[in-house]
Amino acid sequence: MKTVIMTSHRSLTKIPLMMDGKMNKSEENVGTLPLPTLKRLGFLPEDFDGSKYTSQSWTNYINSIGMGKALYVQTLAEPIIQQLNHEAIILDYKKWATIGMKPWLNARQLVLSKIQEHLGIGMYSAREDDQIVEHARRKGVRIPSLNFQWLIEHRNDAPIIKLLLQKKNLDMKIFQWSKLSKFQNRDGEVSLSGAWNGYSSYSGRFTARNLAMAALPKEMRQCYRAPRVRGKPGVYLSLDANQIELRLLAGAAQATRLLGQFQNGIDIHKYFTSRLLGIPEREVTDTERKLGKSLVYAFLYGAGKSKLDKIITKSNMRIIQAPSELLTTLYPQLMSLVDSFRDGNVLYYALQPTNVEPRIGPTWMQSSSKQNLPVQSATSMLMKQVMTQINDKVKVVNVIHDEFICLCCFDEVDEIKAIIQDGFVQATRSLGMALPASNLLEATILGGYA
């Protein structure tokens, strides 16, 4: 093994490169991966100059730090992800402008009316941010900045600040998604597509630039217009993997109670919330369940006590036990695994330990990132492996974190769901993961079909 000193702008980083290693199954494809992807797979800083190193060097280094499986999955998935650059979701823009955006337009009108009433001004003034600021000043409320961050931080200082923030949020959404009008074809259709990055973060998530396909508004889904498929009416089919992070953690930790709950179709968030609030499960409301779900995922993604306290305070609900204590009581094996991520001396990726310290170049990771990355990366790797399993059977047009959006015939919905369900089972087995697969996929037809 040869130690090579690689220089970044910030520091010298010692990287062990097995320069005399033999070519393995990743070597023949690693050269096709973009350099930023290789750097992220190697947990190297973005400004690291890796252009002078060979594919063999990259392969050996990434294998040596325990990221060989991630590299192999990425080499298989990268061309499939890049195929998404040539796929699109068809939007009926007229329907979107008249029906889809209507809830936003109605909400904006309501906010403007409240601003009028609160400040005693006309509709013209209520539409103008500067006028709102001036009239608020006359009533003793100073708003020195229209910056979103300032408004968010001070939204509870005065009702008019919260109303102004709501107005600006709605203005931004309406403006952003109205711009699609210029992309209509003669049939009033807009093709929604993005430029995909197969490894956009250190967790391995793949995302679309230009148009953020993962951020398409839910209100838009009723306005999609699927083309015909093999002469039959087509549909866009959403297949969402329910609670994939919790499932992967339950499998990795062999969390007995949690595995049983998934197997039996128990509503885990309602179960947790009932014990958090000290009420029967049947009495848990949707709002209360939402609090429980927010706390579970905030904790699993690395939130500390102060963040959890803020979520609870904002809800105005009374809890009888701290969320972290309750999770430890209910799911001790899962919490033990999460603690190993947070407290370990090495970085975990896809729920398994690597051979590297938890840092990117000279910058050490915060505890929350050490806890978050193993879960996020496991989901990303599994979704990529599923794509390789189903690529020749299913036409995927978009991927949103743990959700596949596919184009298929209207009478193929059950068949496509079964194929993707089997894809998860096969992918889990290939990666050596454990995933409770009962009630895994939720199928939804998006919009209508031609």
What kind of region is each of these model predictions?
Residues 2, 11-15, 19-20, 24-25, ...:
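Acidic, glycine-rich two-metal-ion catalytic cores of nucleic acid-processing enzymes
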Residues 3-16, 24-125, 253-263, 333:
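Mixed-charge, glycine-rich, non-catalytic linkers/tails in nucleic-acid processing enzymes
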Residues 69-160, 301-338:
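Extended, well-ordered alpha-helical scaffold/bundle regions in very large, multi-domain proteins
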Residues 105, 407-415, 448-450:
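Short glycine/threonine-rich loop-to-helix capping motif typified by GTGT followed
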Residues 291-301:
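Short, amphipathic alpha-helical "recognition" segments used to contact nucleic acids or chromatin
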Residues 306-308, 402-407:
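Short cationic amphipathic helices and targeting signals
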Residues 390-395, 429-435:
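Short secondary-structure junctions
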Residues 430-450:
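Short proline/glycine- and acidic-rich turn/helix-capping motifs at secondary-structure junctions
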